[in-house]
Amino acid sequence: DGSGGEFVFLEDGSIGLISSEGDVGRVSESLDKLLEFLVCAGCISDFNCRYFYCNDELIKTFCAKYIEKRREDCQKEGFSWDESRASLAKEMSIDFNPNSFAELAMEFYKSATREPLFTCRFGSGDDAYVCDGIMSDIVGLWTQELVGMSEEEILAMAK
């Protein structure tokens, strides 16, 4: 994942992630879908706040603002986010459609939350450590700034 974590193929053909931060979970139903998501998302941990998935409008807004921010950042560096991502997707023979990014994010969420969950336990008995799940209850400050909402507003929309 670029930071010491590992993606793993699970028995059912889905893809799991064991992150370097100790988060573990299923992240996609297939390698192609994972790559399509990552071409847009770049980083799975940017999409691990479970509250964004409780409201269709909230996840659509988050994804649109996320892509808008990526486009602005790339433009400042002198290149096109869309062209670079389209080229990358073409090299990997996968689809690239930023307009369907919210649907890809929702597929990630459904994979991450479907039973049975992919988990890891290290050790046994009282000394066992069970890793945190891939989805989080934390509403990060940068995500609040990105969507222009407070944590309270996001939580209210998630109900």
Protein language model features and the residues they cover:
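A C-terminal-region feature
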Residues: 1-159
